[in-house]
Amino acid sequence: MPSFDTVCEANFVEVKNAVENTAKEIGTRFDFKGTSAAVELKDKEITLYGDADFQLQQVEDILRNKLTKRNVDVRFLDAQKPQKIGGDKLKQVVKVKNGIDSEQAKKIQRLIKDSKLKLQAAIQEDKVRVTGAKRDDLQAAMALIRKDIADLPLTFDNFRD
């Protein structure tokens, strides 16, 4: 039976490159000279540092631009609230989403069930596998998921015939 997987995974090689390019630009820009503005990547979290709120926002804008240039969807980013870390310095943690959470997976499963297509959707850890008898139904399901679940940067892989 034909099937495909619906996943939500960022290309971490490109994320790492974008963070490195952001750090390089922060080091060379005149308006960041003599400030504590910085960016670092640990595991699946990007940490932004700055002296003021507007500076933190500028660092985040640079990061988003670099990610966009590297074809990484910025919907993968989940920015937390800025925190004070001593003196006037601020820190902001930006989590990189990886995988579909159970609530979104159930939403995708319900969407496919309600579509009246002859398909089955199974939640497998952090992805949703959709199986069906006809390839056309699978393609219709892909279009339906793209249209209705716009807040997640979903991709489809492991397409089997």
From Swiss-Prot:
CDD domains (UniProt xref):
YajQ_like
State any single GO MF term: nucleotide binding
Q: What is the role of the protein in this entry?
A: Nucleotide-binding protein.
Organism of provenance: Acidovorax sp. (strain JS42)
**Record keywords:** Nucleotide-binding
Q: What is this protein called?
A: Nucleotide-binding protein Ajs_2750
GO annotations of cellular component type: cytosol
| Family indicated by similarity | Belongs to the YajQ family.
* Stored Pfam families: DUF520
Lineage, top-rank taxon, reads Bacteria
